[in-house]
Amino acid sequence: MDIILGVVMFTLIVLALVLVILFAKSKLVPTGDITISINGDADKSIVTSPGGKLLSALAGAGVFVSSACGGGGSCGQCRVKVKSGGGDILPTELDHITKGEAREGERLACQVAVKTDMDIELPEEIFGVKKWECTVISNDNKATFIKELKLQIPDGESVPFRAGGYIQIEAPAHHVKYADFDVPEEYRGDWDKFNLFRYESIVKEDIIRAYSMANYPEEFGIIMLNVRIATPPPNNPDVAPGQMSSYIWSLKEGDKCTISGPFGEFFAKDTDAEMVFIGGGAGMAPMRSHIFDQLKRLKSKRKMSYWYGARSKREMFYVEDFDGLAAENDNFVWHCALSDPLPEDNWDGYTGFIHNVLYENYLRDHDAPEDCEYYMCGPPMMNAAVIGMLKNLGVEDENILLDDFGG
């Protein structure tokens, strides 16, 4: 009898605990549909299930907020204003949002949990963002570690972007072997030297990254990107290679690729001020877009120059394009500086780092460098060096425009 009584008591205790858990769940875990009101416009409101993050809920309803890191909380781009229902701001958001901005409701959509009805504000241009499945036209090396990915937009479609804008590219889970990359013989020296073909990239979930466009708006029907492969650094070869760059480098003619956009804020100012463009590495992309747009579409007569830094002649690309623009436009000149020219380059042009070359050969003797507008995109060290040099010349922040996606 004691055994039976013990079993009964144990069963009753378990049932009681289950009831407590179910009751707590009903109070703590949201059920039913969640309504997200957007910009006070009933037509823009979306209804979704609770759980997940605001960024995903918006994307599921066809509202694509920029997120270069794919929702990891590291890029700080997916900023929205949450007027109610977002809960407390998280420590991960405070790396990108000031306390003052937080008081105004600024949040990162990728960090906001969807638990209850919400009221948010989004920029109106977000509603012009679309998604396309594109076809790879070509994916060719332009330098040792840079490919030009050219995508065909579906027939009848267009991407209404501005020069300096960017798109987001999606990659499914994948397993990429560097040994399968198509790298022309002229670029294989460093690949063999650093044994780069041994690497593989294994990604077990969908990812999203942002890339600036190299084409300009009147190159219709295509999207063109300059993508630098993110290989592990030589001093830490066991680090995993870049996920998205590895995927992009694996793409072949005819492959399908999903993009969304357009996004952007790295746009040219509508003034008559002199424009100075500074680029390096894959930072070529928005520079090409801007310069082509100014000279070919806008027929701009603004004085402009382009200063590009590369290691050697092998790393220079679009040379004929810029030579042609310089020949056709008296208001445009361009210069390339090589930091490590090879003997076979027979280089008689500028040498050294591009910020020093720009200063020594142009800005040092410029009548008013502080009055120019500076547009730059390149590796972080280049960007920092250029900004430091410009600050020393008295250039205000408003005249220094930086695209962080290049390089």
Curated annotation (Swiss-Prot):
GO terms for cellular component: plasma membrane. It comes from the Bacteria. The keyword NAD applies. GO terms for molecular function: 2 iron, 2 sulfur cluster binding; electron transfer activity; metal ion binding; oxidoreductase activity, acting on NAD(P)H, quinone or similar compound as acceptor. The keyword Transmembrane helix applies. Its main location: membrane. InterPro entries: 2Fe-2S_ferredoxin-like_sf (IPR036010), 2Fe-2S_ferredoxin-type (IPR001041), Beta-grasp_dom_sf (IPR012675), Cbr1-like_FAD-bd_dom (IPR008333), FAD-bd_FR_type (IPR017927), FNR_nucleotide-bd (IPR039261), NqrF (IPR010205), OxRdtase_FAD/NAD-bd (IPR001433). Residues 32-126 form the 2Fe-2S ferredoxin-type domain. Its EC number is 7.2.1.1. Residues 129-269 form the FAD-binding FR-type domain. It is an enzyme of class 7 (translocase). It is found in: Cell inner membrane. Gene3D superfamilies: 3.10.20.30, Nucleotide-binding domain of ferredoxin-NADP reductase (FNR) module (3.40.50.80), Translation factors (2.40.30.10). Binds 1 [2Fe-2S] cluster. It catalyses: a ubiquinone + n Na(+)(in) + NADH + H(+) = a ubiquinol + n Na(+)(out) + NAD(+). SUPFAM superfamilies: 2Fe-2S ferredoxin-like, Ferredoxin reductase-like, C-terminal NADP-linked domain, Riboflavin synthase domain-like. Residues 272-389 are annotated as: Catalytic. It is a single-pass membrane protein. Keywords: 2Fe-2S, Cell inner membrane, Cell membrane, FAD, Flavoprotein, Ion transport, Iron, Iron-sulfur, Membrane, Metal-binding, NAD, Sodium, Sodium transport, Translocase, Transmembrane, Transmembrane helix, Transport, Ubiquinone. Composed of six subunits; NqrA, NqrB, NqrC, NqrD, NqrE and NqrF. NQR complex catalyzes the reduction of ubiquinone-1 to ubiquinol by two successive reactions, coupled with the transport of Na(+) ions from the cytoplasm to the periplasm. The first step is catalyzed by NqrF, which accepts electrons from NADH and reduces ubiquinone-1 to ubisemiquinone by a one-electron transfer pathway. Belongs to the NqrF family. This is Na(+)-translocating NADH-quinone reductase subunit F. The gene is nqrF.
